[in-house]
Amino acid sequence: MKLYIKQRVFSFVDKFSVKDENGTDRYFVEGRIISLGKKLHIFDSEHNEIALVKQKIVSLRPKFVVEVNGEEVAEIVKKITFFKPQYYVEGLGWNVEGDFFAHDYVIESNGAEVVSIHKAWVSWGDTFELDIADGNDEVTALAVVLAIDAVLHSQNATSSAFFGNI
């Protein structure tokens, strides 16, 4: 399954859609900044909330929790490294490798690819493509990708951008 997020600048108070391979709106995402952290709500095509990405407030480093259908399934954890950022998806056992700032990375589970993220050129403009491997939960994969991006951009105190250069 391939999902696409159109390139533009988002903030946590913005709304945007995630399209499928046919250009149809498959998911809707709405960001909110509340007094106790940032939240990103993910809705299905019938506007039912199916996932939530929320900032973990009490933490030394930016952390985001992923909930799917009201159940916490993952926490994005930044590994301590000196050179390039590395992430681990706690709760799912997923490892994340690649160039996060260019949105060109892969999420793996036990050496098998779960989802790859890269820039793609499609008819509706510059987008980032999420290629979700068969047998994987696309909602969880989408929420984890959005959470990784939220962690990246929360580390930059001067930036309120969401999903980088999108």
Residue ranges and their predicted role:
Residues M1-I166:
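Intrinsically disordered, low-complexity proline/glycine-rich segments
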